[in-house]
Each structure stands twice: as C-alpha cells, then as structure tokens.
Amino acid sequence: MISSVQNVSNLSMTRALGAVDTENSASSSAATMPGTAGAANNMSFASVMGNMASDAVSSLKGAESMSFAGIKGTATTREVVDSMLQAEQTLQTAIAIRDKVVSAFLEVTKMQM
C-alpha cells in the first residue's frame, strides 16, 4: 500500500493517471509481496511514514506558494489549479492513512490480553 501511495505522489498532474514511471512500477511490484516491502529498500515503517509526511508538507507548501504566485500574476491559472489539485490529492491521501492508523490502533486496544 505504501508503494502505491508513493506512486500516486510521483504522478504529475499533466500526465494521465495510468502513466507511471517504469522504474517505480517495477520496484512497487516487488515491494507488494508480503514481507518484502521493508527488506527491498531497507527502510523502516517509521522512516517511510516520515518521508511521506515530509513529502506531503512540501506539496502543500508548494501549492501555497503557487497560489501566491497566481495572486501576484506570475503564474498561470492552469499552474495554480494543477498545484492545488495535487495538494488536495496529497491531503486526501494523508487523511486516509491517518484514518487507517487510528482504526488499527483502536482494534489493537480492543484486543484482550
């Protein structure tokens, strides 16, 4: 799932959603097998989540700066809209991941010990 989220964040707003870099899709197919996601690139779950959070923050900051550029008139409307749509997609992904983590935590706390 994490590799799919990374592939989504790597998509450009100007390319079709089905177009993914072949390098990323090849590595994601190997990483989707159970038990190999962390072993494929030697990254821990915490570091992957940290990288995703920092990517999300940079995407949101980029959209904010692009909106200011649009207000100043230095960016086209299309650039501003593309940047805002990418930021919205990033935010929706972060919210979905947060909801899944909270749900998993609640399930663990309901377990009897």
Curated annotation (Swiss-Prot):
Do you know which Pfam families this protein is assigned to? FliE
Where, per UniProt, does this protein localize?
Bacterial flagellum basal body
Going by the UniProt record, its keywords in alphabetical order are: Bacterial flagellum
List this protein's GO terms for biological process. Answer: bacterial-type flagellum-dependent cell motility
Q: Does the keyword Phosphoprotein apply?
A: no
Q: Tell me yes or no: is DNA repair among this UniProt entry's keywords.
A: no
Cellular component terms, GO, for this chain's entry? Answer: bacterial-type flagellum basal body
One MF term in GO for this entry?
A: cytoskeletal motor activity
Give the UniProt family note: Belongs to the FliE family.
Could you tell me what this protein is called? Flagellar hook-basal body complex protein FliE
